[in-house]
UniProtKB/Swiss-Prot annotation:
[4Fe-4S] cluster 2 binds at residues 135, 139, 142. It comes from Kluyveromyces lactis (strain ATCC 8585 / CBS 2359 / DSM 70799 / NBRC 1267 / NRRL Y-1140 / WM37). It is found in: Mitochondrion. CDD domains: Radical_SAM (cd01335). Pathway: Protein modification; protein lipoylation via endogenous pathway; protein N(6)-(lipoyl)lysine from octanoyl-[acyl-carrier-protein]: step 2/2. Gene3D superfamilies: Aldolase class I (3.20.20.70). This is Lipoyl synthase, mitochondrial.
Amino acid sequence: MLKPGIRSVQKRFITETVVRSTQPSVSRRRKTTHFTDKLNKGPSFEDFVNGNAQKFTLDPLEKARQNSEEVQRLPTWLKVPIAKGSNFHKLKNDVKELKLSTVCEEAKCPNIGECWGGGDKSKATATIMLLGDTCTRGCRFCSVKTNRKPSAPDPTEPENTAEAISRWGLGYVVLTTVDRDDLVDGGAYHLAETVQKIKQKAPNILVETLSGDFRGDLEMVKVMALSGLDVYAHNMETVEALTPHVRDRRATYRQSLSVLECAKKTVPTLVTKTSVMLGLGETDEQVLQTMKDLRAIGCDVITFGQYMRPTKRHMKVVEYVTPEKFDYWKQKALELGFLYCASGPLVRSSYKAGESFIENVLRGRSRARI
């Protein structure tokens, strides 16, 4: 026989069980997922049965993300000779000896043979990459190494960079950096110091810096603009609609526009410059709007080049744009009032043809002031 206390507990347990079993169960609906949304937008089972699935088209972002069959072989206009020549090997040895990094090597630029191997040393161009060879961001088009916490900046780098450039006897040099979101100033003071040391060792050298967005900190943009450089470059990379897919989430289209605008307002005589890749799935209307946005903030120079997939881990090419189309965009840029436009399948933001033109413009301005 059960004790009174145990009988009471047993009775309460049975009662609660009966109540729970008679109450209607409330089903909890799962939150709609991104995967479900994609399924709902796509063809149904009935569409597949009826053969209508092909009628569903992808928007530009989906096309850029999923394209795999349309583009296979590299067109003839994108094939380049193997890099060689005495100047090429001299620059390569100097870079290695002074423990410098170049975007030419790290980003696997197809123009390295042309830029480094010119017959005239004064026309050779190397884009020095400062603050190490490891970026804190992970853009889907870029082959530069990434890490959340790269090694600390090398304090001797500004001096070594200035020494290398003075050895090469260049008339024009480009400095660029990886993004360093781990640093409070984004590396702005390190880059500014490098510009100043170059100007001390070789006052006649024209200096272009291709910098990041400093997380939108416009005070750091001003530090760079006031460092003594001649050309302030910051790349838009792509059109606004594709920016979230192509670039790291910390880089935005409007933020990049604000960087170029701030640099121009800080030092109005600065030449401001940007670069846009084509072949990512952009439309003509989007490219034209990007150029209009850039002219609205006073950007002087723009370059267009073909996106080329560095490795299979990176986003795929949607389209190989023809040389004729690049000529079309150059004409449009000049019509909109850009000071200069370099546009071609192999053109990159630091392409030497553009630098030669800008060098002549800047030196012409200098002579006019004397």
